[in-house]
């Protein structure tokens, strides 16, 4: 017996509405963060760079500085500030190492790990050097 038209396939994965909403919020926050960085003179080199180590939300360059930016969207900027955990920092650092290996032309740049905090009805807060590779 075959499934009728429109019936879900056995291997199809359906995302929960909460996950879909979180994904859309994340994309929106990353777009706001990228626009903010561009307005501040950065050039966006990559967005959502994925590796086995983790994901970098934004890789941005300004002059000889390379910023790996983690974007956090929460109900308040304070909540967002606490959302970058030490474990996540290590995953971002690992992903940054992979990015640098695949983009050796940037190896001599100054490196910085930033956080961009996003909350409704607030300007983004850019935390320069939110963490470093020694943490």
From Swiss-Prot:
Ranges annotated as spanning the membrane: none
Q: Name one GO molecular function term.
A: nucleic acid binding
Parts forming coiled coils: none
Signal sequence, renumbered to the chain: none
Pfam family of the protein (one): UPF0102
Q: What HAMAP family would the database entry show?
A: UPF0102 (MF_00048)
NCBIfam families documented for this protein: PRK12497.1-5, YraN family protein
Of which family is this protein a member? Belongs to the UPF0102 family.
Q: What is this protein called?
A: UPF0102 protein Nham_0146
Provide the species name. Answer: Nitrobacter hamburgensis (strain DSM 10229 / NCIMB 13809 / X14)
């Amino acid at each position: 017996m075959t499934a009728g038209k429109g019936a879900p396939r056995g291997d199809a994965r359906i995302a929960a509405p909460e996950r879909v909403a979180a994904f859309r919020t994340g994309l929106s926050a990353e777009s706001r963060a990228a626009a903010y960085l561009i307005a501040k003179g950065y050039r966006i080199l990559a967005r959502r760079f994925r590796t086995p180590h983790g994901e970098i939300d934004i890789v941005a360059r300004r002059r000889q500085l390379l910023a790996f930016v983690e974007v956090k969207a929460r109900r308040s900027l304070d909540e967002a500030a606490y959302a970058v955990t030490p474990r996540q920092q290590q995953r971002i650092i690992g992903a940054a190492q992979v990015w640098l290996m695949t983009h050796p032309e940037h190896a001599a740049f100054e490196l910085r790990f930033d956080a961009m905090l996003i909350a409704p009805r607030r300007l983004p807060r850019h935390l320069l050097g939110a963490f470093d590779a020694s943490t």
